Amino acid sequence: MSAARRFFVEGTQELGGVVEIGGSDARKIGRVLRLRPADRIEIVDSAATAFAASIDSIGSVVRATLL
């Protein structure tokens, strides 16, 4: 997956979990990359584990489910 669609989150995550992305990363997802719900991104947690994720909702906070 393109590095432009890779986002870093705090803490450790698990498959099936939901992550919330805010701030400038949320703006980048919604306005710069113009991604939409169901689009795929990559999430990297604090343990450097990478997950594929599907966007659930986009606003001031982006919610995505880890696949």
PLM regions: where:
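N-terminal positively charged helical leader segments and presequences
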Residues: 1-67
